[in-house]
């Protein structure tokens, strides 16, 4: 059984009806994965990549836990000026990659396109926009 896919299906079921519940499930899933990778690290993955994975997950979790102190950026945006104002900066591409890890990107992309976002837009950005529009 693919537990990640099953968990993603549960998130999709809640997303349109109870977005706050879907957000909680995403945060819980990220916390569980962060703990799993700390307790049972993949020894074949270079240590720097393992550390980067934790930093990315913690960055996304901080943004999801405290949206009032967060700003979404992209991989090309200089974030230092926003950090000077105490904002937690998170790359939308980073968040989108985690949504793909939950296997819910198809749902979010379809939602964004149904809201009028062009099908030619980058799928990572449609993934992000779908998540934002859903709440």
Where are these regions (language model features)?
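An N-terminal assembly and electron-transfer interface module characteristic of large anaerobic redox
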Residues: 1-135
């Amino acid at each position: 059984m693919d537990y990640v896919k099953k968990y993603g299906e549960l998130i999709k079921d809640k997303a349109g009806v109870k977005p706050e519940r879907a957000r909680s499930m995403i945060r819980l899933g990220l916390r569980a994965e962060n703990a799993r990778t700390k307790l049972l690290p993949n020894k074949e993955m270079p240590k720097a990549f393992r550390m980067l994975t934790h930093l990315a997950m913690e960055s996304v979790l901080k943004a999801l836990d405290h949206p009032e102190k967060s700003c979404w950026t992209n991989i090309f945006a200089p974030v230092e000026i926003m950090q000077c104002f105490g904002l937690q900066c998170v790359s939308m591409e980073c968040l989108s990659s985690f949504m793909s890890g939950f296997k819910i990107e198809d749902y979010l992309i379809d939602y964004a396109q149904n809201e009028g976002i062009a099908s030619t837009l980058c799928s990572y950005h449609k993934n992000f926009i779908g998540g934002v529009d859903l709440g």
